A protein has these predicted regions:
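Hydrophobic alpha-helical transmembrane segments and adjacent short intramembrane/lumenal linkers
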Residues: 131-145
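Predominantly long cytosolic amphipathic alpha-helical stalk/bundle segments
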Residues: 9-110, 122-134, 161-197
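Hydrophobic positions within alpha-helical transmembrane segments of bacterial inner-membrane proteins
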Residues: 109-120, 149, 153-161
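Hydrophobic alpha-helical membrane-embedded segments
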Residues: 1-6
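Hydrophobic aliphatic residue packing
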Residues: 117-120, 138, 142, 155, ...
Length: 197
């Protein structure tokens, strides 16, 4: 449930931030107002790219604000690498705890099957103890077998549906992160007056 809320918040906040990013031609003013945005994947990617660009700018001999000199291709590659690392970190954070759900999807049917086999063995044991194949001898084992099968399915089916829905949301946000990283680097490389207030 918490993963669903996390992804819903991330998706909504991502769309809001993306709209602001596209409307705002000035990174510095966007960074000044970053506090109004939730701490979501795109905001974290932006912060990483922005801070890397500022480091490169401060290390450069050129004054970007006064003579509108853009980044060199090697500087852009450094920014792109920082943004790509941030995208990977955010993807890992989004996928956190999904392994637990995947394990439930995979393991529950097998636990149900184990219970079924155990119940059938119990039914045969009941037949052997009573010396007959009467319903009263096999019913407890069969009912136990069916119960564990039902429990396994009750766990597996909702887990599978939840896993698939959450995975779909994660893929959607991951695509947005990849697209944003390209858009961010492209915007920096195409706008020489990007840093002016």
């Amino acid at each position: 449930w918490t993963k669903s809320v996390q992804l819903k918040t991330a998706s909504t906040s991502t769309n809001i931030f993306l709209t602001d990013f596209r409307k705002n031609k000035n990174l510095a003013s966007l960074m000044k107002n970053i506090g109004k945005h939730h701490n979501t994947p795109l905001v974290n990617i932006f912060k990483s790219g922005y801070s890397t660009a500022l480091e490169i700018k401060s290390e450069s001999n050129s004054d970007f604000e006064s003579n509108n000199i853009g980044f060199t291709s090697s500087q852009l590659e450094s920014i792109r690498a920082a943004v790509d690392c941030s995208v990977a970190d955010q993807a890992l954070e989004l996928e956190d705890q999904m392994g637990l759900l995947a394990t439930a999807v995979s393991a529950a049917p097998f636990l149900g099957l184990l219970g079924t086999v155990w119940g059938v063995m119990d039914a045969f044991s009941g037949m052997a103890d009573s010396g007959s194949a009467a319903l009263s001898a096999v019913a407890p084992g069969i009912s136990g077998a069916l119960l564990t099968t039902i429990i396994g399915l009750i766990v597996a089916l909702p887990s599978m549906i939840g896993y698939n829905l959450l995975s779909s949301k994660i893929r959607h946000i991951a695509v947005q992160m990849d697209n944003f990283s390209q858009e961010f680097v492209s915007k920096i490389s195409n706008e020489n007056n990007f840093w002016e207030d």
